[in-house]
């Protein structure tokens, strides 16, 4: 069973937004602050713990269960490894692409962890969830009330914001039955125009906060090449301080809300307001024309 005092959080976001990188760097900073943490990777790529473990990919619960014949044949120490600053690391895994339900791994892994006492002596459990889908098995941490606080990693790019709004819609669906709440938007900067201001505006419309703006810095890629978090690779760097600031905000966050997702028309109007999209009067004129022709 799960201790009621544990804060169960989840990171969602569009595929490729840097969700796993952002979550691992933030959780590493939280561990530095003395928080006892377990990461449960809920992405079939099994990349949610690699920076913590200095590894390519951790062996997943589903992979080992398939080898043994059943998840009941596994031992906890086989699927739960210890990484940076004592962070416990588990990857749920998934089936081969195109075969079966990838969300099944999440359900199997969480049930196994609960039944085998993995949630003991923890302050935080973090679920790192695949891409922009909040349906089926991937919604399981939300639907079953496992994750109580959701943090959406986004940016000033249109599709990242579109995904954030869709995820907010999924949270709203289960907010009353499962008690899940939105903890805030994390802007993982892509250096688009007026990005921080844009995400602040989106957050307000979604009835939440931009909990932190993470600037773009090449040191993140340098650390990733070494399979390390920034906090471990370059602890005194400015980027390391950004992740520590975000970590502190999550630890102290008490602004947990039921989101108010917006319609596509309102999202497009917001993008037009900030110059990401052209307004309708110009839209028809620029469709299919190269940049030179629209100057």
From Swiss-Prot:
Cofactor: [4Fe-4S] cluster
GO terms under biological process: nitrogen fixation
Modified residues (ADP-ribosylarginine): 104
Keyword annotations: 4Fe-4S, ADP-ribosylation, ATP-binding, Iron, Iron-sulfur, Metal-binding, Nitrogen fixation, Nucleotide-binding, Oxidoreductase
Reaction(s) the record says it catalyses: N2 + 8 reduced [2Fe-2S]-[ferredoxin] + 16 ATP + 16 H2O = H2 + 8 oxidized [2Fe-2S]-[ferredoxin] + 2 NH4(+) + 16 ADP + 16 phosphate + 6 H(+)
Documented EC number(s): 1.18.6.1
Chain sites annotated for binding [4Fe-4S] cluster: 101, 135
Similarity section: Belongs to the NifH/BchL/ChlL family.
Role description: The key enzymatic reactions in nitrogen fixation are catalyzed by the nitrogenase complex, which has 2 components: the iron protein and the molybdenum-iron protein.
Subunit structure: Homodimer.
Name listed for the protein in its UniProt record: Nitrogenase iron protein 1
Organism: Trichormus variabilis (strain ATCC 29413 / PCC 7937)
Gene, per the UniProt record: nifH1
